[in-house]
Each structure stands twice: as structure tokens, then as C-alpha cells.
């Protein structure tokens, strides 16, 4: 008993410290000036490859930026027509965006032979960069959000979008004051830890971190459920276990 008491006190102290540290991190996550993000009212463009990317991978970022009062736009580079379901998937995308708070007028879907929904086709990053820049300039965008070089799942279309924003930045073509955030790809184990990945996400380097509340997580689930044509059994498991349904870590280019 004499030995147990100090150990219990130590455990309690560690627990309190952990709670305070997580709370402090949460405070930093919800303050745009501390996170290095543009302030409220800023126009943010999410750039995705396929309908359902916005819900499968970026829901924490979308809802986190909405929490910070960003005006959100979505540019989807394909209609997701790999299985000839393009028309269905466009409607599902608009429904998902509505759940996530992005109005139809702010959703742009590209249907161009240069950008087929096909993991075996490498999109031309220069062509993608030109299209992306047009939308950035036309909408007065201050923040672009897209995939990192790993593309989360390694899909070649995701990776091409990262190459496109890197091309724009390297050539100095982005408008003054426009920054780029990329979504961190993580290893397979972390990818399916859901909220258990939070300690790793807090400890490891990143420029921005968004973690959904329980209510927001339910909203993300509803958005993903709009993509009925894609809800095969393994995607239902993904919805339950993937950290990307609850946590997004991002870095500035």
C-alpha cells in the first residue's frame, strides 16, 4: 500500500498533465493566428481528384476551417467515371458538400479527357497546374488545400495534384498571399487507428491539425454516406476506423 500510493499520485499527475497538454493543443488548433492560417473570412480552395475524396480524406479540414469561418470552395478534377458512374457520383458529391457546408455554387467539377479517373493514367502536372491557377485567380483564393506527395492512398491522380501545386509554387505563379497546405500521408498502422492516433498526431511535426468533435464526426459520416455508389464493405470499415474521418495533419509547402 505504501508503494502503491506514490505510484497512484504519479499516475494522476501524468494524467492531469496529459489532459492539460491536449487541451492546450486543442486551443492552438482552433486559433487561426496561432496555427498560421489565414483569418476568418478567407477564401479556401480544396482540390481533390474524385468525388468522395472530400469526405474520405478532408472532412476534418473542411469542418475545421468552417469552424474558423473560412469561405470554402471545392475543385474536383474528375467526375469519378472509372466505372461509368460519373453522373451518379457528381450528384453524390453535391450532396456530400451540402452536408459539409459547401454550397453547390462553390463546387466545381472538371470533366476533361486530360484528367480521367484512372490510377494507371498519369495526369500532366503542368496542365493540372494551369487549370488550378485559373480557379485560384477567378475566386480570389488565399489558401489551397490538397494532397501531399504520398496522396494518402498513393493514387496517381492524388499525387498529380500535389505535383501541380508544387509546379505553381516553384514557378512563382500563385497570387501574392496565397499559401498551400498539403494533407499528411501516414503509414498503414496509423491510418486505421482512428482517434488512437491523436497522441502521434499531436507529437509529430505538422503545421496545422484538425480534430473533429463527436458531433462533427457524425457530420463527416453523413457526408461519406452520401456516396452510396461507393459504399462497399471495405469503405464502411474505413468510415469506422480511418483517422482521416476524425483527424487531419497538414503542412505548408
From Swiss-Prot:
Catalytically driven reaction(s): a 6-(N-acetyl-alpha-D-glucosaminyl)-1-(1,2-diacyl-sn-glycero-3-phospho)-1D-myo-inositol + H2O = a 6-(alpha-D-glucosaminyl)-1-(1,2-diacyl-sn-glycero-3-phospho)-1D-myo-inositol + acetate
Membrane listed as a keyword: yes
UniProt cross-references to Pfam families, sorted A to Z: PIG-L
Keywords: Endoplasmic reticulum, GPI-anchor biosynthesis, Hydrolase, Lipid metabolism, Membrane, Transmembrane, Transmembrane helix
InterPro entries for the chain: GlcNAc_PI_deacetylase-related (IPR003737), LmbE-like_dom_sf (IPR024078)
Localisation: Endoplasmic reticulum membrane
Pathway participation: Glycolipid biosynthesis; glycosylphosphatidylinositol-anchor biosynthesis
Bilayer-crossing regions: 3-23
Statement: the UniProt record of this protein carries the keyword Cell wall biogenesis/degradation: no
Signal peptide range in chain numbering: none
Membrane topology: Single-pass type I membrane protein
Superkingdom to which the source organism belongs: Eukaryota
GO BP of this protein: GPI anchor biosynthetic process
EC number: 3.5.1.89
GO cellular component terms, A-Z: endoplasmic reticulum; endoplasmic reticulum membrane
Family: Belongs to the PIGL family.
Free-text note regarding domains: Retained in the ER by two retention signals, one located in cytoplasmic domain, and a second signal in transmembrane domain that is functional in the presence of membrane proximal residues of the cytoplasmic tail.
Protein name: N-acetylglucosaminyl-phosphatidylinositol de-N-acetylase
Organism name: Bos taurus (Bovine)
Amino acid at each position: 500500500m505504501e508503494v502503491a500510493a506514490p505510484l497512484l499520485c504519479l499516475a494522476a499527475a501524468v494524467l492531469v498533465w496529459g489532459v492539460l497538454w491536449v487541451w492546450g493543443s486543442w486551443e492552438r488548433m482552433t486559433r487561426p493566428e496561432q496555427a498560421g492560417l489565414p483569418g476568418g473570412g478567407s477564401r479556401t480552395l480544396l482540390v481533390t481528384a474524385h468525388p468522395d475524396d472530400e469526405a474520405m480524406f478532408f472532412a476534418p479540414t473542411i469542418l475545421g476551417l468552417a469552424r474558423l469561418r473560412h469561405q470554402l470552395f471545392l475543385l474536383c478534377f474528375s467526375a469519378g467515371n472509372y466505372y461509368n458512374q460519373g453522373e451518379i457520383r457528381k450528384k453524390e458529391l453535391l450532396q456530400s458538400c451540402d452536408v459539409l457546408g459547401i454550397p453547390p455554387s462553390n463546387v466545381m467539377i472538371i470533366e476533361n479527357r486530360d484528367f480521367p479517373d484512372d490510377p494507371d493514367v498519369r495526369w500532366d502536372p503542368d496542365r493540372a497546374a494551369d487549370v488550378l491557377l485559373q480557379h485560384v485567380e477567378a475566386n480570389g483564393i488565399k489558401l489551397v488545400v490538397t494532397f501531399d506527395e504520398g496522396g494518402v492512398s498513393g493514387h496517381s491522380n492524388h499525387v498529380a495534384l500535389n505535383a501541380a501545386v508544387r509546379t505553381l509554387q516553384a514557378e512563382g505563379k500563385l497570387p501574392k498571399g496565397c499559401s498551400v497546405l498539403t494533407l499528411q500521408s501516414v503509414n498503414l498502422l496509423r491510418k486505421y487507428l482512428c482517434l488512437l492516433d491523436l497522441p502521434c498526431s499531436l507529437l509529430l511535426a505538422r503545421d496545422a491539425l484538425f480534430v473533429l468533435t463527436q458531433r462533427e464526426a457524425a457530420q463527416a459520416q453523413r457526408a461519406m454516406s452520401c456516396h452510396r455508389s461507393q459504399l462497399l464493405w471495405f469503405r464502411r470499415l474505413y468510415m469506422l476506423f480511418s483517422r482521416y474521418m476524425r483527424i487531419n495533419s497538414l503542412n505548408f509547402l
